């Protein structure tokens, strides 16, 4: 989230963009969804998943409309700059020319109707990659910009804490099982405690923290440097992810087909809705990365239809993954990281496949952690940046990376409850990024567009949900979710 206009990059077709967006949305959250489904009940989970997916689609169209409006503003400013330069070149005009110039200046104060008639469609073409931070600075006031960065930073901290916990948890589960009496893999029927022994005198929690320390030492230093994910690394991790998902779905279907399915999920259990909601919101998170995905698409003529198709496919995939999981495994045996349910001999006979699935999150998450850390560091720098100012070397190279790295590692040190981490991150910061920010962006950009270009201007990428009712509905849903989750957590804590 650099907060500025960046290079568009190499263009790609709409269908390639569809694949990129699918890969962006379907990530770590999908691995925690089966357990959340089993806890909340299959009917409640299905209804909430579809509704959250629909709301995410609505706000995605909001964000795309705001991107088009931002492009129009930037394009109009460039046109204004060129006109001013032309005016300076014609400073020796005659009296009649001056009169014409006076008429022109008066016309400039009115909405640009001539521009609307000539090229209003092209005016809103999305060609410049305007990041969310830049859009916030264009349409929000100073308080709004600061709240935007606070929300983004909180979400990225949650992301890093989830990643920092997921890798050591996977390593602990696999290696403790292999080194113990059950050398055949993770025993999901056994109820392990953090105080159970793993290696000799070392408890499971000790092994987890050792892995966390190794993870921090190996990947933490990247926070102090600039790093980006190469195309080939992205292709490799994407292939690993889809191979893993395909194996899990096929194996679960085979077990169910053979009559070995152990799952009997309830229809509804409202006590599990809080975690499910956070997981669902987290699993549809993409709005903060839309400028990087949408802008390079070569033809955006039917982009809204493609987005709808993408969301339908993602819903189908989440449903397939979660329903095969909850009917294949008992609810109390489903683990926070669904991949660990397949690290058992009775589920997967081939040792190589067991280790691949058990350690799959380690490889994919480890490649993402430095990227997110650098993004968070840059957001901190942007938040405190002042025009024309520079940071001292110590602040730039030591302080910002340190405040980026330390908090999520401390959170991961204190807890490795991945389902709760995902739920809290999604329910709070995720609600802000996915609902509140796009809703305010589209509302304010519409007002700004009307003031600048006139009330008859039509944004070619405007959302199908163009009525103000939808903005109010999204905000009402967001604040209702926020208060519901907060009340649930408070009531749960007071009962302990």
Swiss-Prot record:
Q: What is its main location?
A: membrane
Stretch list, region Disordered: 81-100
Q: Which residues lie on this side of the membrane: Cytoplasmic?
A: 1-10, 58-146, 226-233, 287-306, 376-397, 443-470
Top-rank lineage group of the source organism: Eukaryota
Composition-biased stretches (Low complexity): 91-100
Supply the alphabetized keyword list: Glycoprotein, Membrane, Transmembrane, Transmembrane helix
The cellular location(s) given in this protein's UniProt record come to:
Membrane
User: Where do glycans attach?
Assistant: 193
Q: How does it sit in the membrane?
A: Multi-pass membrane protein
Q: What Gene3D superfamilies does the annotation carry?
A: Amino acid/polyamine transporter I
Q: Which GO terms describe its cellular component?
A: membrane
Q: Which residues cross the membrane?
A: 11-31, 37-57, 147-167, 205-225, 234-254, 266-286, 307-327, 355-375, 398-418, 422-442, 471-491
Chain ranges sitting on the Extracellular side read 32-36, 168-204, 255-265, 328-354, 419-421, 492-496
**Family, as annotated:** Belongs to the TMEM104 family.
Q: What is this protein called?
A: Transmembrane protein 104
Task: Give the organism the record lists.
Answer: Mus musculus (Mouse)
